[in-house]
């Protein structure tokens, strides 16, 4: 006889997860789990059902892969029959903290720990679905094995979104981040219809109520820089921006744990306690101490905790429109300035480009291994509509509110990776503080022609010699050569966008 457990408390879910051998309790009180062969998202296993009501609005391709509607129905029924014979966990949550723009979701999971994950990352409302909206369903059977020949999937696991039926199916997926990002993709499709820009960004607010957004790909400092002891956190990853509001799409944080320390990340460290989940981290068999430096399972170790675990947060989970918007890039070529001031068109250009640079090899070796990465809207895997839809909405929001936009390089200066040096965290924090304090809203600038960027001539607390990157290199000619290489990559990447000429003109210039 199988049981359905409805809307269990955190303590009960932890208790059942331990009783069912789904994880272990760490010395800090968190539940430690492993996710098997998948320790990150599986883009090749993510699909959107192709059906008439949404087919013309989705940007189909290697990211948004089509799935047959009849095959979806058959697989959903198969997974539902499978999970009906097991103990299962059901929770009722919201995705989106705005009273107008939330989605009510019935989440059914095969494991207790993934239900706890959903309750940590989504929003646990005081009353479920007060506006009586149409309900979405998540069906998550982690131990179900798909058969590609029978099910039409790519492998033994899948994530499939069906907009027409308001269903999200996860089968064979132990990595819980898939569930969070699937619902982000759902909101990223739906919100633009309501004049709301969905954003892959973190957000915080000053004590006087001024909101700041941080966009950036993994490793650029989004989570670290938004966790500011002098400001209140709204959220660390997913937000919507509509007329009069910035709201969190989530109710929790999903932070990277690699090399986590109390000294460097006190807010995250303190949030990992009873009720939090730690994913793919080794723990000592005797003391049960987590070892965040051990990457034998993955470098993508994570912790999932509710926002209640962050002391200095915005209780309502939303705030006013942003005074300041920061695009973070970790430029390992050393070409970009530490801070640039962007016009609305330049903001659209860099938003569409979504540039950062990674070391291509896992061995942090020579600078020849550098790889420039362009991820549209600073989160290409999660945006189902054509990119221009989001860029136009960004410019509209900036125009209507008058937000100031900045490009901040948290990467290298004085030369590429291996030759130059990384901007220190105090330097980056001084730049962020100057932006948030309004010190750069109206300042004298220098125009860098090739990059087509405006750089402030003075930033409080920052060495003026760092502001123009060309002057920090030993050889200006060497810098110019590297700059042209990077500019050529920007230009080549931007050819895929069909946007207004004014946006193209706001980008770097080859030659």
UniProtKB/Swiss-Prot annotation:
Superkingdom, according to UniProt? Answer: Bacteria
Q: Is Isomerase a UniProt keyword of this protein?
A: no
Q: Which GO terms describe its biological process?
A: gluconeogenesis
Q: What is the reaction catalyzed?
A: oxaloacetate + ATP = phosphoenolpyruvate + ADP + CO2
EC assignment = 4.1.1.49
Class of enzymatic activity (EC top level): lyase
Q: Which cofactor does it need?
A: Mn(2+)
| Keywords, sorted A to Z | ATP-binding, Cytoplasm, Decarboxylase, Gluconeogenesis, Lyase, Manganese, Metal-binding, Nucleotide-binding
| Pathway membership, UniProt | Carbohydrate biosynthesis; gluconeogenesis
Q: Where in the cell is it found?
A: Cytoplasm
What is one term from the GO cellular component aspect held by the record? cytosol
The record's annotation in SUPFAM superfamilies points to: PEP carboxykinase N-terminal domain (SSF68923), PEP carboxykinase-like (SSF53795)
> Main site of residence?
cytoplasm
Q: Which GO terms describe its molecular function?
A: ATP binding; metal ion binding; phosphoenolpyruvate carboxykinase (ATP) activity
Task: Decide whether keyword Transmembrane helix is in the record.
Answer: no
- Note describing how the cofactor binds: Binds 1 Mn(2+) ion per subunit.
- Where ATP is bound, by residue? 181, 200, 216-224, 265, 302, 428
The UniProt annotation places substrate binding at: 41, 175, 181, 302
InterPro entries per the UniProt record, alphabetical: PEP_carboxykinase_ATP, PEP_carboxykinase_C, PEP_carboxykinase_N
Cross-referenced NCBIfam families, in alphabetical order? pckA, PRK09344.1-2, PRK09344.1-3, PRK09344.1-5
Q: What does this protein do?
A: Involved in the gluconeogenesis. Catalyzes the conversion of oxaloacetate (OAA) to phosphoenolpyruvate (PEP) through direct phosphoryl transfer between the nucleoside triphosphate and OAA.
How does this chain assemble? Monomer.
Q: What is this protein called?
A: Phosphoenolpyruvate carboxykinase (ATP)
Q: Which gene encodes it?
A: pckA
């Amino acid at each position: 006889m199988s049981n359905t457990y409805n809307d269990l408390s955190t303590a009960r879910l932890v208790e059942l997860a331990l009783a069912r051998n789904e994880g272990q309790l760490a010395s800090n009180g968190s539940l430690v789990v492993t996710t098997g062969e998948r320790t990150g998202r599986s883009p090749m296993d993510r699909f959107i059902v192709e059906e008439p009501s949404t087919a013309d609005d989705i940007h189909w391709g290697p990211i948004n892969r089509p799935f047959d509607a009849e095959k979806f129905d058959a697989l959903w029924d198969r997974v539902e029959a499978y999970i009906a014979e097991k103990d299962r966990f059901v929770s009722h949550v919201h995705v989106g903290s705005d009273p107008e723009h939330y989605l009510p979701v019935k989440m059914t999971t095969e494991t207790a720990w993934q239900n706890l994950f959903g309750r940590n990352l989504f929003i646990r409302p005081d009353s479920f679905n007060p506006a009586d909206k149409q309900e979405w369903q998540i069906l998550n059977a982690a131990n179900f094995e798909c058969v590609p020949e029978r099910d039409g999937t790519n492998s033994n696991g899948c994530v499939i979104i069906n907009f027409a039926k308001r269903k999200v199916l996860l089968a064979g997926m132990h990595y819980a981040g898939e569930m969070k990002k699937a619902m982000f993709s759902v909101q990223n499709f739906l919100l633009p219809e309501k004049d709301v820009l969905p954003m892959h960004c973190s957000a915080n607010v000053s004590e006087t109520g001024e909101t700041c957004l941080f966009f950036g790909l993994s490793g650029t400092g989004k989570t670290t820089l938004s966790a500011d002891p002098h400001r209140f956190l709204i959220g660390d990853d997913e937000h919507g921006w509509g007329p009069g509001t910035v709201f969190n799409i989530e109710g929790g944080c999903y932070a990277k744990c690699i090399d986590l320390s109390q000294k460097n990340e006190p807010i995250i460290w303190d949030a990992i306690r009873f009720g939090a989940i730690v994913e793919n981290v080794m723990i000592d068999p005797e003391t049960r101490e987590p070892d965040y430096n051990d990457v034998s399972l993955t470098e993508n170790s994570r912790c999932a905790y509710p926002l209640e675990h962050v002391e200095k947060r915005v209780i309502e989970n939303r705030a006013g429109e942003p005074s300041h918007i920061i695009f973070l890039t970790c430029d390992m070529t050393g070409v970009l300035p530490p801070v640039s001031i962007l016009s609305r068109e330049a903001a659209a250009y860099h938003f569409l480009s979504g540039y950062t640079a990674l070391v291509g090899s896992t061995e942090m070796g020579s600078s020849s291994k550098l790889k420039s990465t362009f991820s549209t809207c600073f989160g290409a895997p999660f945006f189902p509509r054509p990119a221009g839809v989001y860029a136009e909405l960004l410019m509209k929001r900036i125009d209507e509110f008058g937000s100031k936009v900045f490009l901040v390089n948290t990467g290298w200066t004085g030369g590429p990776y291996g030759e130059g040096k990384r901007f220190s965290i105090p330097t980056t924090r001084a730049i962020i503080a100057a932006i948030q304090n309004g010190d750069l809203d109206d300042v004298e600038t220098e125009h860098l022609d090739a990059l087509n960027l405006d750089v402030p001539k003075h930033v409080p607390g920052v060495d003026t010699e760092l502001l123009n990157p060309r002057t920090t290199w030993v050889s200006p000619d060497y810098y110019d050569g590297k700059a042209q290489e990077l500019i050529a990559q920007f230009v080549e990447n931007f050819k895929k966008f069909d946007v207004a000429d004014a946006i193209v003109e706001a980008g770097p210039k080859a030659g």
